[in-house]
């Protein structure tokens, strides 16, 4: 009796066309390293195999230290910056970001010292801020511009090396100033939040300045729309357990909701 082996059949077909597992790994790594990142669907089409097989390949390659897995794909371990230009990000999920920023305005009070990161959601927060006596500390040039016509708001700029991509200041000078300030609360966003409660950033420059701002703050508030959930990026910024409140626009997954409840993290929709 002939027993059909799907595994043997697949291996024979791949070998016949020169696309065995090793060659497939090479194809996957070459494409991801060239593009910086790739989705599971994209890789499945290029390798002409199932999405499930690609997921297994990516998990195996991550264990070998050859790439980083993300939700729905993978990124190159040679990549140092996965961030998008600010002028692109400001229009993505703009309605949701404005909604979240408006809800976070309840945090404001007179004479507060407020830290604002260089995220597009913080930029919406800066635009919506009423002109009340307070101080804003920021590394974002666009936050400065948003506040320039609000005379009651004093703005402290971190200085540092200017990034035209992010329209913000970074580096040792920025971090040096933040280490010497006392901030009542900071507003920041991120590139992703996974179901284990880890908060991710697209590059070390952003992550490092945000960490220093959070360390200088009595309270830290995360503003993140639904597109950030179940998603990783390049650099782990911190954990949700380190923040006080999460402002968002959608319900959390059961896993993430349980994490927030366990760690007493308030979630505001």
Predicted features along the sequence, with ranges:
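HTH-adjacent hinge/linker in prokaryotic transcriptional regulators
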Residues: 2-4, 8-27, 31-47, 52-118, ...
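Alpha-helix/helix-capping structural signal
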Residues: 120, 141-142, 251
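A generic structural-conservation signal
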Residues: 70-71, 138, 157, 269
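Short Gly/charged-rich anion-binding patches and loops
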Residues: 27, 56, 99, 124, ...
């Amino acid at each position: 009796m002939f027993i059909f082996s799907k595994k043997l059949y697949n291996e024979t077909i791949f070998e016949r066309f020169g696309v065995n597992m090793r060659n497939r790994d090479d194809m996957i790594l070459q494409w991801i390293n060239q593009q910086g990142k790739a989705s599971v669907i994209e890789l499945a089409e290029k390798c002409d195999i199932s999405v499930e097989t690609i997921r297994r390949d990516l998990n195996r390659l991550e264990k070998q230290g050859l790439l980083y897995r993300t939700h729905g794909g993978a990124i190159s371990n040679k990549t140092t910056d996965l961030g998008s230009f600010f002028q692109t990000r400001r229009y993505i999920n703009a309605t949701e970001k404005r909604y979240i920023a408006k809800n976070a305005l309840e945090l404001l009070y007179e004479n507060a010292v407020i830290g604002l990161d260089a995220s597009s959601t913080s930029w919406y927060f800066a635009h919506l801020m009423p002109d009340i006596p307070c101080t804003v500390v920021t590394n974002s040039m666009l936050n400065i511009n948003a506040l320039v016509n609000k005379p009651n708001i004093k703005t402290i700029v971190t200085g540092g090396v200017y990034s035209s991509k992010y329209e913000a200041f970074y580096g040792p000078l920025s971090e040096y100033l933040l280490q010497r300030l006392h901030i009542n609360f900071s507003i920041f966003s991120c590139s992703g939040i996974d179901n284990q409660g880890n908060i991710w950033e697209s590059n070390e420059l952003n992550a490092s300045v945000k960490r220093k701002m959070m360390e200088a703050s009595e309270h830290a508030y995360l503003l993140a729309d639904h597109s950030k959930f179940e998603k990783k990026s390049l650099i782990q910024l911190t954990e949700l357990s380190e923040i006080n409140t999460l402002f968002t626009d959608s319900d959390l997954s059961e896993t993430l909701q349980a994490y927030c409840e366990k760690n007493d993290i308030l979630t505001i929709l």
